[in-house]
Amino acid sequence: MDYFTEYKLSKYKEIEPLSDKGTTVLVYDTVERELLVKKVVNAEIYKIYKKINDIECDYMPKIIDTIKVEDEYIIIEEFIKGDSVDYLVKQKGAFSEEKAVSYIIDIGEALKQIHSRNIVHRDVTPNNVIIDKNDRAILLDLDIARIEYKNESRDTTLLGTAGFASPEQYGFAETDTRGDIFSMGMLLNFMLTGEVVQKKIYTKTGLYNVISKAIQIDPEKRYRRIEEFIIDVSAYCPEKIVTEKNSKLLYKIAYHLPGFRTNKIYKKIIAIILYFAFLWDIYNTIFYREVSFKE
């Protein structure tokens, strides 16, 4: 292990395991002073994280670092504080249509980014979606994801969560992005009913048709792309979605400005002071030029 890699690993102090196997651990970054998640993954999953580590999306954890130490592959990612959809539904009951659609659109935004890199998530489930303090749905866990290969006839590794995994994940065909659309239909139904489709399917509004199309056994009969699914879902809650997206516009712009990217309060305060001083200087320069011109 070289000195730089050793230094990077040394700054992450392990707090507690987040999985039974101990491969996912809550850590504290002693330099940035923030909680993060450390994962030990296999070589294939490491490749997937490398493919998405430059994605900036509000609805999935930010990849902080990818570290290879001999035969060990380590991912450091943002820690998302909140409750899972599974927990919330079991504790408080099914969501309203407005709430469910809002969350599904958030998750859809994350999947759009993932699918754009030819990656299939394969585990879109209530346990892998966290509702954060800003009431956003965050999609977690790429630990059984796969890169989409067009020439394969079926998945070589059978993985997934019963009740949400597509038939393809059980070896009937190759899993592509339509497998995630199947899971999204199952997830939407769970949010609205509190049950898996096999026990109860949502029938109150036209969302029944959206869910039914998404969860077709034959992938050819499903939505072809996640964008198509989201468009149909959005039709049942358009006003709220438009309002939310407009309200997030300034936040998204600010997120890309220096001082706001890490979401640390002290950095935001310093940035605001500096930006104000900069704008004040510009104002004074323009004002004095106008005065001089008039004289």
Residue spans of the language-model regions?
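ATP-binding glycine-rich loop module of kinase domains
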Residues: K11-K50
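Conserved HxN/HPN-centered segment at the entrance to the catalytic loop
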Residues: E56-D65
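Conserved short submotifs of the Hanks-type protein kinase catalytic core
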Residues: E70-S84, L88
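Activation segment signature within eukaryotic-like protein kinase domains
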Residues: Y103-I104
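Conserved catalytic-loop aspartate of Hanks-type protein kinases
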Residues: D180
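Conserved C-terminal C-lobe helix
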Residues: T203-I217
